């Protein structure tokens, strides 16, 4: 087998390996992003916490919780702090 054919086969093998590895990492990232609730989404204290340590507000009975920024965070974002 010529050296050019070997080089092409090696290159195809490396590209295939890198593509599979990159796809596995991407699926891990999306799975971890799904495991937390974004701002103004429904959350749960134990099963689905808020992303980025955003605080949550629950109903009086604790049956409905939602990720919301507090007043200080909202003012800080408005001012740009």
Curated annotation (Swiss-Prot):
GO molecular function: ion channel inhibitor activity; toxin activity
InterPro entries, per database record: Spidertoxin (IPR004169)
Summary of the tissues where the protein is detected: Expressed by the venom gland.
Keywords tagged on the record: Disulfide bond, Knottin, Secreted, Signal, Toxin
Domain of life, per lineage: Eukaryota
Residue pairs linked by disulfide bridges in the UniProt entry: 36-51, 50-67, 58-65
Annotated coiled-coil segments of the chain: none
Entry's Gene Ontology cellular component terms: extracellular region
Signal sequence region: 1-22
Prosegment residue ranges: 23-34
Compartment annotation: Secreted
Pfam families: Toxin_9
CDD domains assigned to the protein according to its UniProt record, in alphabetical order: Spider_toxin (cd12960)
Annotated family: Belongs to the neurotoxin 02 (plectoxin) family.
Domain-related comment: The presence of a 'disulfide through disulfide knot' structurally defines this protein as a knottin.
This protein's name: U17-lycotoxin-Ls1a
Organism, as annotated: Lycosa singoriensis
């Amino acid at each position: 087998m010529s050296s050019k054919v070997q080089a092409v086969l090696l290159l195809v093998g490396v590209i295939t390996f890198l593509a599979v590895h990159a796809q596995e990492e991407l699926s891990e990232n999306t799975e971890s992003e799904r495991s937390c609730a974004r701002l103004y989404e429904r959350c749960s204290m134990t099963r689905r916490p808020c992303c980025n340590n955003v605080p949550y507000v629950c109903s009086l009975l604790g049956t409905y919780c939602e990720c919301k920024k507090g007043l200080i965070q909202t003012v800080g974002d408005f001012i740009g702090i």
